[in-house]
Design a protein with these regions (language model features):
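N- or domain-start disorder-to-order transition segments that initiate the globular core
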Residues: 1-25
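M16/MPP (pitrilysin/insulinase) zinc-metallopeptidase core fold and M16-derived inactive scaffolds
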Residues: 28-98
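Short amphipathic alpha-helices in soluble, non-transmembrane regions
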Residues: 101-103
Length: 103
């Protein structure tokens, strides 16, 4: 099975991979960071996973946590850390895409 997509690199170096499927009125956003547990030093482990969880606590632009606004929008989201990467993801109604990208 082949899935059609486009890939663009923004001026800030962020790679954007886009696949469009208009079957349902939802959007999935998945942000990958090219850092994971393999980047940790022996004896100093767990930081990649810690930072993944800290992403859910808010930011300078949004200090109310990650999950409440997604839940209010009827969305689902989570994150993961593996040796090669850390990521966060959201699945939202198309009308909540800006929220998912903002968080």
């Amino acid at each position: 099975m082949e899935i059609a997509y486009t890939k663009t690199t923004l001026a800030n170096g962020l790679d954007v991979i886009l696949h469009e499927d208009h079957t349902l009125p939802i959007v999935a956003v998945n942000v990958w960071y090219h850092v994971g547990s393999k980047d940790e030093r022996p004896g100093l482990t767990g930081f990649a996973h810690l930072f993944e969880h800290l992403m859910f606590e808010g930011s300078a632009h949004h200090d109310h946590g990650y999950f409440p606004p997604l839940q209010d929008a009827g969305a689902a989201g989570n994150g993961a850390t593996i040796p090669e990467r850390s990521n966060t993801w959201e699945v939202v109604r198309t009308g909540a895409l800006e929220l998912a990208l903002f968080l």
